[in-house]
Regions:
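Family-specific signature for flavin-dependent thymidylate synthase
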Residues: 1-249
């Protein structure tokens, strides 16, 4: 058994992403048919810088629905089941997660929380529990197999003892608007540390591939200029909403 390490890889994104978003925005405000404009967009006859400027200006007004036409697909590994339980609550997305029924989890990797890792006694207790859990899981599989439950049938019952720390792998697809919402929530310091780390890696990829859409993405305070979380939960990076308004910012 060993500790898992977070890895995020972009598998694919909508081809001609900027042109798709530009065309969608143009269709909203143009009496013409953007299908006729498309060959010029993909043929380089409309300057990408001009497209990006137009998209940025319209997004600034709060019109975001056209960015939904572009999506990103990521492969993620080295995350815990605790993380994926949070992740799949973002409903406007598609997920394909490694199955604990069809995959034998003997010797499973696990995610060790940093705050536990800092305390020697806590780390020892945690790692010993992981070892005991792996032994129990393996023994349960053996007993189930001895009583006629083979392969996935043994896995599906033995998995009930697996912890939330157990490492998982998942493929997810989100459109740009869903990603903007995801980053607003999960890049915030209030977000759980593990999903925040994953969100920041995803954002770095999105920002590199489609900067015009994601240039202001991240925790909500970045776009707002103030912290909307209230005095109890603020991290102090930005002034509170009431403070910001009182100062006229």
């Amino acid at each position: 058994m060993s500790q898992a390490k977070l890895k995020v890889r972009l598998l694919s994104m909508t081809p001609e992403a900027l042109a798709v978003i530009y065309a969608a925005f143009r269709q909203c405000y143009s009496p013409g048919y953007v299908g006729d404009l498309w060959p010029k967009l993909v043929g380089g006859q409309v300057d990408p810088a001009e497209q990006a400027l137009f998209v940025a200006d319209v997004m600034e007004s709060g019109h975001l629905s056209p960015v939904e036409h572009v999506s990103f697909t990521f492969a993620v590994e080295g995350v815990s089941r605790a993380l994926t339980h949070q992740l799949v609550r973002h409903r406007l997305a598609s997920y394909s997660q490694q199955s604990q029924r069809y995959v034998n989890e003997s010797g499973f990797e696990y995610v060790l929380p940093p705050q536990i890792a800092k305390i020697p006694e806590a780390r020892k207790l945690f790692e010993e529990f992981m070892d005991r859990t792996a032994e129990t899981y393996g023994r349960l599989r053996e007993l189930l197999q001895d009583h006629g439950r083979k392969g996935a049938k043994a896995n599906e019952d033995a998995r009930f003892v697996l912890p939330q720390a157990a490492e998982s792998k998942i493929v997810l697809t989100m459109n740009c608007r869903s990603l903007l919402h995801f980053f607003a929530l999960r890049c915030c310091e209030r977000a759980q540390w593990e999903i925040r780390a994953m969100a920041k890696e995803m954002l770095a990829i999105c920002l590199k591939r489609l900067p015009v859409v994601f240039q202001h993405a991240g925790a909500r305070c970045i776009g707002l200029g103030y912290c909307p979380e209230g005095e109890r939960f603020t991290c102090g990076r930005y002034p509170l909403q009431s403070t910001s308004f009182q100062s006229g910012e």
